[in-house]
């Protein structure tokens, strides 16, 4: 009879402990119900990239002096710089410039070390495409500035996320459609 009482006591303790664990899990669930949703309806709502976001590279053809520093500092020697030497002025003249974004690792070395600042990083991150060969941008495609997410009136921007700094939010305060959850 003593073993039966001991077994019942152990069973009761285990049942109480299981109820505590279920209660703890339920409290976590209730805690998460009070939080704001983190889901972003992507095509219609977009995040504002941070100030130091490294997106697609923008190239200014007129500023480039064809020094090829960008090619030397690139870990994968990606930028293709085609130039010819003008013998009358003894200077290089840029003929073409291209970057394949299907291979680019967006490290930003080319932008950082460019002596004439003809390269810059944009906030464009939508580079998805069906054919990878279309990601090879020449100087004309690199020269196009992307439509800013903030200036596009058809898209709501999400700016009250915790990882954004106050400066980046205040810098974009003139946007028309800001979703506050």
Curated annotation (Swiss-Prot):
[4Fe-4S] cluster 1 binds at residues 64, 67, 70, 114. GO terms for biological process: photosynthesis, light reaction. It is found in: Plastid, Chloroplast thylakoid membrane. NCBIfam families: ndhI, NuoI, PRK05888.1-3. It comes from the Eukaryota. It is an enzyme of class 7 (translocase). Residues 55-84, 95-124 form the 4Fe-4S ferredoxin-type domain. This is NAD(P)H-quinone oxidoreductase subunit I, chloroplastic. InterPro entries: 4Fe4S_Fe-S-bd, 4Fe4S_Fe_S_CS, NADH_quinone_OxRdtase_chainI, NDHI. Belongs to the complex I 23 kDa subunit family. GO terms for molecular function: 4 iron, 4 sulfur cluster binding; iron ion binding; NADH dehydrogenase (ubiquinone) activity; quinone binding. Its EC number is 7.1.1.-. Its cofactor is [4Fe-4S] cluster. Coiled coil: none annotated. Binds 2 [4Fe-4S] clusters per subunit. It catalyses: a plastoquinone + NADH + (n+1) H(+)(in) = a plastoquinol + NAD(+) + n H(+)(out); a plastoquinone + NADPH + (n+1) H(+)(in) = a plastoquinol + NADP(+) + n H(+)(out). NDH is composed of at least 16 different subunits, 5 of which are encoded in the nucleus. GO terms for cellular component: chloroplast thylakoid membrane. It holds the Pfam family Fer4_7. [4Fe-4S] cluster 2 binds at residues 74, 104, 107, 110.
């Amino acid at each position: 009879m003593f073993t039966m009482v001991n077994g019942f006591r152990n069973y009761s303790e285990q049942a109480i402990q299981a109820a505590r664990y279920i209660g703890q899990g339920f409290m976590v669930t209730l805690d998460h119900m009070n939080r704001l949703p983190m889901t972003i309806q992507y095509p219609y709502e977009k995040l504002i990239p941070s100030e130091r976001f490294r997106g697609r590279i923008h190239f200014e053809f007129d500023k480039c002096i064809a020094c090829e520093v960008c090619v030397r500092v690139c870990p994968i020697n990606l930028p293709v710089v085609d130039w010819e030497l003008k013998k009358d002025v003894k200077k290089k003249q840029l003929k073409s410039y291209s970057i394949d974004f299907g291979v680019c690792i967006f490290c930003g070395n080319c932008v950082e070390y460019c002596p004439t600042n003809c390269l810059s990083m944009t906030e464009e991150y939508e580079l998805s495409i069906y054919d990878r060969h279309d990601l090879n941008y020449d100087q004309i495609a690199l020269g196009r500035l992307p439509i800013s997410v903030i200036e596009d009136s058809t898209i709501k921007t999400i700016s009250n996320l915790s990882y954004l700094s106050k400066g980046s939010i205040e810098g974009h305060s003139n946007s028309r459609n800001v979703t506050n959850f």
